[in-house]
Amino acid sequence: PAGIGWARTPKLFMKPGEQKNFCIVDAAMNDLPRPAMYQAYHAIVPLEAAGAQQEPQVYDVVGPICESGDWLGRERSLAVAAGDLLAVLSTGAYCSSMGSTYNTRPRPAELLVDGAAAHLIRARESVSDIYRSERLVPTKA
């Protein structure tokens, strides 16, 4: 079910602005397209306490793809610091089935957590994996 999964993403950097602040993370619209496609809401929370020392600020949480639709959450109040990990919640049925390799971004690994044990159930793709089945058309002499 969707409610039991979550996506972990490192925060790449912050981009303060006059009208908006952006929290740029490694996850992108190719990993979780629901927010970009139909403004689906996914809670986003810090996984580490480093940012807890900071006052919460309002951010748009966006990915690194240069697309206007590459966002995971808008106007989120977060206390985050450089290097924090964030969790995008309720993604269980969505990341795996809806994710893509858009912009040659490999799909992330998937883990199954069973109590204190975590099991790798799908390895992270590489760029080589993406291109493996493609074939070039021979050029004419």
Predicted regions and their residues:
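Charged (often Lys/Glu-rich) extended helix/loop segments that serve as interaction or gating elements
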Residues: 1-141
